Amino acid sequence: MTQHSRDTPQFYLTAPSPCPYLPDRSERKVFTHLVGEKAGELNDLLTHGGFRRSQSIAYRPACDQCRACVSVRVIAGEFRPSRNFRKVLARNADIVSQLRAATPTSEQYSIFRAYLDQRHRDGGMADMTVLDYAMMVEDSHVETRIIEYRRRGADSDINERGDLVGVALTDVLSDGLSMVYSFFEPSEQNRSLGTFMILDHISRARQLGLPYVYLGYWIEGSRKMDYKGRFMPQQRLAPTGWLRVDAKDESQHESRD
């Protein structure tokens, strides 16, 4: 095998399978492997083109008759939290986020397992073992980090390791942060931790001077994915490129399941 063939990505198309987001529809994906010295550059390029990363695979929908999955990225520097978002921030004022190396722990897996059992027991990840989780975190040839979210008591020092309540697996791109996967302690669902972690990533991107936070696919009408449309202003990937969408352009629903 030549160096050129190793560095040139090969793309593959999956067979049709039931869509996990919209009823009575099927999905197909195009994917490639993120390996080699240029994996980070390729991940950057493909993310800009609407791909998502899962371990060492980059993929995007390639459905025959459906274009419901729309890549979205929040414009971090212009984002201003709404009244409801400010309530979420206040509700989680006792939560401290810490950036760590992409190293899996049993503490993380315990929450991951509880999260899947409570919220996604019928999903494609429902049977993931601790080894599967370790692979999800570690099998990366790009710049990846773990952000842990811990509860801090009123009298606790900020550096004390409090109870872990949420985790985000995040890629660092040339122009932003890409939230690969996030999960939280289901018993803490009243905190709206999913929303809080997105708000924290927007703040982190702004502090790092990065313009965007990539949220993955927004699917209008999908209970699982529709919430991503609430973080404005944002850009959505269309056939002509990334198009800006502001809050005034569409009605917003200020609650996340």
From Swiss-Prot:
HAMAP family with a match to the protein in the record: Bpt
Chief site of localization: cytoplasm
Keywords per UniProt: Acyltransferase, Cytoplasm, Transferase
Protein's cellular compartments: Cytoplasm
Catalytic activity: N-terminal L-glutamyl-[protein] + L-leucyl-tRNA(Leu) = N-terminal L-leucyl-L-glutamyl-[protein] + tRNA(Leu) + H(+); N-terminal L-aspartyl-[protein] + L-leucyl-tRNA(Leu) = N-terminal L-leucyl-L-aspartyl-[protein] + tRNA(Leu) + H(+)
PANTHER family membership: ARGININE-TRNA-PROTEIN TRANSFERASE 1, ARGINYL-TRNA--PROTEIN TRANSFERASE 1
Entry protein name: Aspartate/glutamate leucyltransferase
Keyword Repeat (UniProt): no
Cellular component annotations (GO), alphabetically ordered: cytoplasm
Function: Functions in the N-end rule pathway of protein degradation where it conjugates Leu from its aminoacyl-tRNA to the N-termini of proteins containing an N-terminal aspartate or glutamate.
Record's keyword annotation contains Transferase: yes
InterPro entries to which the protein is assigned, alphabetical: Acyl_CoA_acyltransferase (IPR016181), Asp_Glu_LeuTrfase (IPR017138), N-end_Aminoacyl_Trfase (IPR030700), N-end_Aminoacyl_Trfase_C (IPR007472), N-end_Aminoacyl_Trfase_N (IPR007471)
Pfam family, one: ATE_C
Enzyme category, top tier: transferase
GO molecular function: arginyl-tRNA--protein transferase activity; leucyl-tRNA--protein transferase activity
One GO BP annotation of this record: ubiquitin-dependent protein catabolic process via the N-end rule pathway
The EC number(s) this enzyme carries: 2.3.2.29
The organism's place on the tree of life at top rank: Bacteria
Family label: Belongs to the R-transferase family. Bpt subfamily.
